[in-house]
Each structure stands twice: as structure tokens, then as C-alpha cells.
Amino acid sequence: MATSDSNMLLNYVPVYVMLPLGVVNVDNVFEDPDGLKEQLLQLRAAGVDGVMVDVWWGIIELKGPKQYDWRAYRSLFQLVQECGLTLQAIMSFHQCGGNVGDIVNIPIPQWVLDIGESNHDIFYTNRSGTRNKEYLTVGVDNEPIFHGRTAIEIYSDYMKSFRENMSDFLESGLIIDIEVGLGPAGELRYPSYPQSQGWEFPRIGEFQCYDKYLKADFKAAVARAGHPEWELPDDAGKYNDVPESTGFFKSNGTYVTEKGKFFLTWYSNKLLNHGDQILDEANKAFLGCKVKLAIKVSGIHWWYKVENHAAELTAGYYNLNDRDGYRPIARMLSRHHAILNFTCLEMRDSEQPSDAKSGPQELVQQVLSGGWREDIRVAGENALPRYDATAYNQIILNAKPQGVNNNGPPKLSMFGVTYLRLSDDLLQKSNFNIFKKFVLKMHADQDYCANPQKYNHAITPLKPSAPKIPIEVLLEATKPTLPFPWLPETDMKVDG
């Protein structure tokens, strides 16, 4: 039963729900406002705090450079506001389609794809030369090849246009988070495991740095390091290999050599710098707005329990038993006052196939602990749709790993959790009844609270980013530390 107690309210973790992928369709039409309104009112009645939505670059800037059309999204935002929910807006600079759960297809803008017809190297590329059109390679971040603009300038202009065209919703407090898309599926990573190219879970994936821009960048980096003879990896296997079948990832393979370490540092640093640069632009675009910036980091839990962490390495997370690949990301976010949003909160090790050597529970503990140690806010979401008590209990445990505190704020607490995703299945009666209990337990058995200040979530105007942190200082965060201890199970079970 819900109550209201000021101490218990400090244990309240807000719950958001991801809207359907095609809520604004590929033709920039908000198709079914009446149907969505009915669903949003059900969410509001269930105590849900807000919703998250992808704001697709491929829809908004479809017609040509700087030709933005925000009208359909304005109608959507108006409806969300009328239903009494808050909004997390994702700047989705990636393609929808080709990843787990993608049921609609929204490519990046055609005028960008047209540039890619004559210059294939604007896309991430694997060693055999296959291009991936989901997202522009970090290699073109600062190349002015898009009708005179760089990729970073494109993203920056888009965010500025969003601010100008959504200023009333920013001022009214509807929009509370801007999640900045930084890669495929909106995640800060390389597209190392594309289903569209035949990758199957739980295989290792492939490095994606063989476009001409990243090749040239690596060539310059090895020359500066005094090793001009070093090349990009040629022994890391194919998408569906296992680590031990490759020269790179096998025991004592290339990944532990000086050459391998140099490559992995370069490959992961490119992502760190990419995120840092775009967050600088996001900070300028939304400076003074009452919003938080956020980014998403992918939960690559397969091969976590072996020495080589192969699937994480191909995705750009240089994480090994003796090197923390996630805490430097958290440290980079700290200067932008940004939230780290992590996936796979619902997963338990025992649910994964044994051949995947999977450790979602340990991975979540590592990433969240690293964020908290860097004094940033961490949020999260489930990776796959689940409607069962076991999954909800795992999410609640991760949201409050050391349980609730009856006398004040909990020692550890996530800033928010976004449930993936709104659907007819979720709203089916028995599923929705369990979901309502989940929301109540996330809220520490408290009534829905419309005033975030009461649970220490007051949103203040966005301050300027702090000065750039030198890469050497970011990489000091790779030194491994033990994660915070977690309770064996939550003290706020939905079925307890």
C-alpha cells in the first residue's frame, strides 16, 4: 500500500517508460495520438513518472541539411505534457533497424546516405570491408565533408534547433533529460555485433575501425609512438568466432602484447574523445536549461567471465580483470554533469547460456560502482522486455543495491530507471498488475511524487562543462577497484 513519509521518500527512484520506436513514423507523422493518449493515462494512473522517446535525426533532418521539421514531435510532446508525465528526449543520431528489438526501420537522413554513396568511408567498417550504415564513424567527427559541416557540427546544429523549437517544453519542465546518442542503438560503442551482418549471440563480434579515416588516425598514432610497423589487428577473427579460436583473444594472445594494448587503448580512447566532444556541444546547446544530460553505455555481458572480455573489447570497452574500461567514461561524464545510463539491469547470470561466459550481475555492479565512485549519477534500463517478478526484483536490487533506509536517503541509489518498453503486452492485465507493483516498490512504497525536490532530484539550470580532463587523468580511472557490496536480493520485492 502506498503512503507518504518524508524519510522514505528519499528512497524514491523515479520510473520512466520508453515509448514505441515508431510513435512518430518514418514519414514524420504522429500516427495514433488517441491510442497513445489512452496508454499514457494508464501509465500516469500506475504512478509512472515519465516517458522516454527517440527523437530521430533521420526523421527531423530528412529533407536536407539544416531543414528541420519538428511539428510531429511538438504534437507528441504536447500530449505527454497533457497526460501529466515528464519526458526524457534521446537525440537519436543512429539508424533504427538492425539491432535487437528493432521492429521499425528509420535510416539516417538520405542526404547523408547519398554522401556515403561516393564516400563509403563515412561509415564504420570491419576488416573485410563491410560498411555499417547505422551511424557515422567517429573518424569523420571533425571532417567537413557533409556540405561543409563536420559530423560534430551536424549533431551540434541539431541539438541547437531542438532547443529553439522546444523552448516552451524546456521552460515548462516537461523535458527533464537530454540523452545524447553517441553510436549504434544510441550507445557509446562501436557497432561490433550487428545482426544485419549475421552476428549471433553470444559470439565475439568484430573491430570496426577499418574506414580510411580511422586507418589514417591509427597510422599516425603508431608513428608517434615509434612503431610505424604496427598495423590494425588481422588476427581477431570474424563476427561469430569464439575468443580461443582467434590469435588476438586466445590465452596470451595479441591482446596482452605491447602492440595489442596500444591498439585497444587507441580504439577505446577514440570513443572517450567522441563522447567528450559531443557532450561539449550538448552542454553549449542546452546551457541554462533545467535539464540533465545523459549518455547510454551498452551492457555487453557475454564473455565477461573470461580473461579476454572479447565482446566488450570489440565494442570499444577496454575492460579486463586488471583494467576498468568503464570508470574512465564516468570520469569523462563528471565534467559535463552528465548521467551514465546503463542497460541489462534485469538480467541474472543464471538465466544466460553457460557457453556465453556471461556476467550481467557483476558487470552491472562494476559499472554502477565506477559511476558512484566518480560521484556522478547513474541510471539504467532493462535490455530486453520482461514482465515477470524475477526480472523486476533484479532491477529494484540494482536501483537500491543496499536496500532502503527508513531514516533518510539510501547509501546507494540509481537516479532513475527506464522500462523498455510501452506495448500492448505490458498493458495486458496480469502483466500490468505486476508492473504497477514494480513502480510502487521503486517508489519505496510511497505515493507518486510530482515534486522531485522531495527525493533529492531537484533539476537546476545546466552549468557549463568543466575544463577538459587530460586523457592521462581519465585513464588513471582504469585502475580496478572492488565494487560496492550488493544485497543478495532486494528488500522491496514485488512479490514479497
Curated annotation (Swiss-Prot):
InterPro entries: Glyco_hydro_14, Glyco_hydro_14_CS, Glyco_hydro_14B_pln, Glycoside_hydrolase_SF. The keyword tRNA processing does not apply. Changing T343V: Reduces activity 16-fold. The active site is at E187, E381. Substrate binds at D54, H94, D102, K296, H301, T343, N382, A383, R421. Changing E187 to Q/D: Loss of activity. It holds the Pfam family Glyco_hydro_14. Disulfide bonds: none annotated. Changing T343A: Reduces activity 1700-fold. One of its GO terms (molecular function) is beta-amylase activity. The modification N-acetylalanine is found at A2. The keyword Transferase does not apply. Keywords: Acetylation, Carbohydrate metabolism, Glycosidase, Hydrolase, Polysaccharide degradation. GO terms for biological process: polysaccharide catabolic process. It catalyses: Hydrolysis of (1->4)-alpha-D-glucosidic linkages in polysaccharides so as to remove successive maltose units from the non-reducing ends of the chains. It comes from the Eukaryota. Its EC number is 3.2.1.2. Monomer. Belongs to the glycosyl hydrolase 14 family. This is Beta-amylase. The gene is BMY1.
